[in-house]
């Protein structure tokens, strides 16, 4: 299978890329046509195997292999082989055991392969006298960085493992359990690397040529201040790790024949944990810096901490009840679904960490060893064992990160009701009427960490008509 996708239109754009899209936006709309076309080649093969051990016990196997190549023969090409094996064993007349293992590769999107240029807009002059409109001036320094194509980016590969039980119960009822675990150790994310640039600031004290009643001009040779600014290159890498696991239940309670209604009940508990293996770096907190840095949102160096210790955790327990009624005489099917989220948990965990290094404005990396923890870092980027008298400094232990704010959040129980009515129109097709969140349940509720009420279940209400035809 071969496919190609390309958008030749420009789309929504700025008429002048030298100007910010809006104040302090740090970005520009990107033309769709600036992104190369997407080429993909894929091939898939599978085979099924059945072994009838005896009249009761049967073993079924499904083996598959998928090959994918994106942007073949280019310097950003990615390829993958994704094998999978699914097994099912009939242990008794009423019990089937099934399991599977496989790899699933996700190709990077075009925004990852061909990142857009990065823009950083900083105010260079801000002179706004209220009584002299003609002299008012607002000027920006715009730093543009051409981000390189992601030549070393790999497919994000997920290892999927699952084990399930299928039970056949009296009355044509069925009960199924499924446990699963998926791990993606190389998901897409930022691969932090820095460059620095110099940004001049001009004020009425130095650099601005002010003539009352006339336009203010700038003497670019006489800035009031020059800042050295850190900026990331926008490089993308395989720096995200995700582990997703859980258990699912499906219970087919059979049919209530007098009213032609089937009852289906399901439940699921899931847990997702994500963390980054990217370099963990931060600016120095402004409270520890002199005003020459804190007032202008700059930092004398970047502080580096251990990676992979912070994570985001999400847990959820949900139940769904579905009723499906067939009305043969009217050639109609009505369905009603009730869903409740009993448990909704999230946590952004920040570990207790101490600095392990720092990056100075010349982009040199310096280690911070355990015996340096009681020392000081000067704004000149040098280490001091005691407080220096001739330069402002930051105590290294003050830059330790504490996890005191890592409090889990538990949201209150919410529920949702939806319905659908489908009508067949002979052999030509049919139509469906549907409504989601039919009770328009969007309550204001508080979470476990705050008494502030916030609206839940938002953007879930919708209704409409679907029309389909049989060709």
Where are these regions (language model features)?
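Face-selective signature of the C-terminal outer-membrane beta-barrel domain
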Residues: 1-74, 246-248
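Transmembrane beta-strands of outer-membrane beta-barrel pores
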Residues: 2-8, 65-73, 101-107, 116, ...
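C-terminal beta-signal and adjacent terminal beta-strands/loops
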Residues: 339-401, 412-413, 418-471
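Gram-negative outer-membrane beta-barrel transporters
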Residues: 200-353
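Outer-membrane beta-barrel signature, preferentially recognizing the C-terminal barrel domain
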Residues: 32-36, 105-184, 205-213, 227-255, ...
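Residues that define the transmembrane beta-barrel architecture of outer-membrane proteins
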Residues: 37-43, 77-81, 157-161, 241-247, ...
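Residues on the lipid-exposed face of transmembrane beta-strands in outer-membrane beta-barrel proteins
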Residues: 2, 43-49, 85-91, 163-167, ...
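Repeated loop/turn-to-beta-strand initiation elements of outer-membrane beta-barrel proteins
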Residues: 54-61, 94-97, 171-175, 257-262, ...
């Amino acid at each position: 299978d071969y496919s190609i996708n390309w958008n030749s239109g420009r789309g929504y754009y700025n008429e002048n890329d030298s100007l910010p899209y809006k104040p302090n936006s740090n970005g520009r709309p990107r033309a769709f046509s600036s992104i190369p076309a997407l080429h993909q080649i894929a091939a898939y093969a599978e085979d099924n195997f059945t072994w009838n051990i005896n009249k009761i016990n049967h073993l079924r196997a499904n083996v598959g292999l998928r090959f994918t190549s994106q942007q073949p023969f280019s310097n950003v090409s990615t390829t993958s082989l994704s094998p999978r094996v699914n097994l099912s064993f009939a242990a008794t007349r009423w019990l089937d055991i099934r399991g599977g293992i496989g790899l699933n590769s996700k190709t990077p999107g075009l925004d990852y392969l061909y990142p857009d240029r990065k823009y950083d807009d900083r105010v260079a002059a801000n002179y706004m006298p209220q009584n002299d409109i003609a002299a008012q001036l607002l000027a920006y320094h715009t730093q543009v960085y051409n981000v390189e194509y992601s030549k070393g980016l790999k497919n994000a590969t997920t290892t999927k493992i699952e084990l399930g039980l299928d039970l056949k119960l009296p009355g044509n009822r069925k009960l199924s359990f499924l446990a699963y675990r998926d791990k993606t150790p190389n998901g897409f994310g930022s691969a932090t690397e820095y460059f620095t640039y110099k940004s001049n600031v001009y004020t009425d004290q130095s650099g601005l040529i002010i003539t009352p009643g006339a336009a203010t001009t700038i003497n670019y040779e006489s800035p009031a201040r020059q800042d050295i600014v850190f900026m990331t290159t926008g490089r993308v890498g395989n720096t995200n790790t995700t582990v997703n696991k859980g258990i699912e239940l499906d219970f087919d309670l059979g049919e209530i024949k007098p009213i032609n209604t089937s009852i289906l009940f399901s439940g699921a508990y899931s847990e997702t944990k994500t963390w980054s293996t990217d370099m963990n770096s931060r600016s120095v907190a402004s409270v520890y810096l002199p005003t020459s840095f804190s007032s202008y949102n700059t930092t004398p160096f970047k502080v580096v901490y251990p990676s992979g210790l912070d994570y985001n955790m999400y847990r959820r327990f949900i139940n769904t009840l579905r009723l499906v009624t067939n009305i043969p005489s009217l050639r109609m099917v009505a369905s009603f679904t009730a869903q409740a989220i009993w448990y909704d948990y999230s946590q952004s965990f920040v570990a207790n960490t101490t600095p392990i290094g720092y990056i100075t404005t010349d982009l040199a990396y310096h280690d911070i060893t355990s015996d340096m923890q009681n020392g000081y870092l000067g704004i000149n980027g040098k280490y001091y064992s005691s407080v220096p008298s001739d330069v402002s400094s930051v105590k290294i232990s003050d830059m330790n990160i504490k996890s005191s704010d890592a409090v889990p959040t538990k949201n209150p129980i919410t529920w949702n009701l939806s319905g659908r009515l489908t009508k067949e129109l002979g052999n030509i097709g049919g139509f469906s009427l549907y409504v989601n969140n039919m009770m328009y349940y969007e309550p204001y509720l508080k979470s476990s960490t705050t008494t502030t009420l916030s609206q839940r279940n938002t953007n879930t209400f919708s209704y409409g008509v679907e029309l389909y035809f049989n060709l």
